Each structure stands twice: as C-alpha cells, then as structure tokens.
C-alpha cells in the first residue's frame, strides 16, 4: 500500500471542564467545553432526589455526576479538568459534602480526570459578613 492509502485518522480527543459547586444546601455539576463558553451537561443534587434534605448529600452528588458524565461521553468527551467551588466570599470557604463524591463518580463513570483545582472566591476584605458586631451566638 502507498503512503496516501494509509491516512492516519487519529481523532483529536475532546476534553471539557467540570465545574462542581458544592455548598451545604446543594451540589451543582456543570460540564462545559474547554473554553467554558458552551454547556455540555448540567445536573444538580436537587434534580435527582425528591426530598430537600437530600440535595447536599454525597449520594445525590454521585448520581448527578454520573448522569452529567454519561451526557458528556455521549457528545464525544473523553476527559475533564475539574474546578471545585464552595460558596466563598463572606460565606463558607469549604466545599460541601458532595464535592468529593462528585469527583469520584466522574472518574468511575469513565471520564479521564485532568487537573483538579479549587476556584472558591476568597475576599480581599470585601463585604461585611452577616451576624452583627459580636457574631452568631450559639
């Protein structure tokens, strides 16, 4: 066979970005293309469970992440870079209980995992936190 007959049809792998927003009230998994401009898939804990109290649970995050990963893989994505975000600002700076479960579920669903980074907004002395002068008294 000649060189022209054997054209190497190596397809470029499609990678995306999984934006995981995890608070103590819900977990949102939003998969976009690599630029972040086009939404590929979006699921939240509230979309997969009935009870409001179950929205932030690791189980809900796991189901939502699996469904988001399946949708992304149907559209030809082979891997994702992960950006984890907590509420941040004057609110909680630590991600909720669903963040860890969502990352593991994405990997288990068959997507390759690239970089994992924390993009929680950190205030540089921004707005005053709620709770008044002496804080929340428990």
Swiss-Prot record:
Q: Keyword set for this entry?
A: Ribonucleoprotein, Ribosomal protein, RNA-binding, rRNA-binding
A Pfam match is Ribosomal_S11
Q: Does the keyword RNA-binding apply?
A: yes
Q: Which residues form a coiled coil?
A: none
Q: Name one GO biological process term.
A: translation
What GO molecular-function term can you cite, just one? rRNA binding
Q: Which Gene3D superfamilies match?
A: Ribosomal protein S11 (3.30.420.80)
InterPro entries reported in the protein's UniProt record: Ribosomal_uS11, Ribosomal_uS11_archaeal, Ribosomal_uS11_CS, Ribosomal_uS11_sf
Q: Where is this region: Disordered?
A: 116-138
Where is it found, in Gene Ontology cellular component terms? Answer: ribonucleoprotein complex; ribosome
Q: Its biological function?
A: Located on the platform of the 30S subunit.
What interactions and quaternary structure are annotated? Part of the 30S ribosomal subunit.
Family per UniProt?
Belongs to the universal ribosomal protein uS11 family.
What is the recorded name of this protein? Small ribosomal subunit protein uS11
Q: Which gene encodes it?
A: rps11
């Amino acid at each position: 066979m000649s060189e022209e007959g054997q054209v190497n049809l190596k397809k470029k792998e499609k990678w995306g970005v999984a934006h995981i927003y995890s608070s103590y009230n819900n977990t949102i998994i939003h998969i976009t293309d690599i630029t972040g401009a086009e939404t590929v898939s979006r699921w939240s804990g509230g979309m997969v469970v009935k009870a409001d109290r179950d929205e932030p649970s690791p189980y809900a995050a796991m189901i939502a992440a699996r469904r988001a990963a399946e949708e992304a893989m149907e559209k030809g994505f082979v891997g994702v870079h992960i950006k984890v975000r907590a509420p941040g600002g004057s609110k909680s700076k630590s991600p909720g209980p669903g963040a860890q479960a969502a990352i593991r579920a994405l990997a288990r669903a068959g997507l390759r995992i690239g970089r994992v980074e924390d993009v929680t907004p950190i205030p540089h002395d921004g707005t005053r936190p709620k709770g008044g002068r002496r804080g929340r008294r428990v």
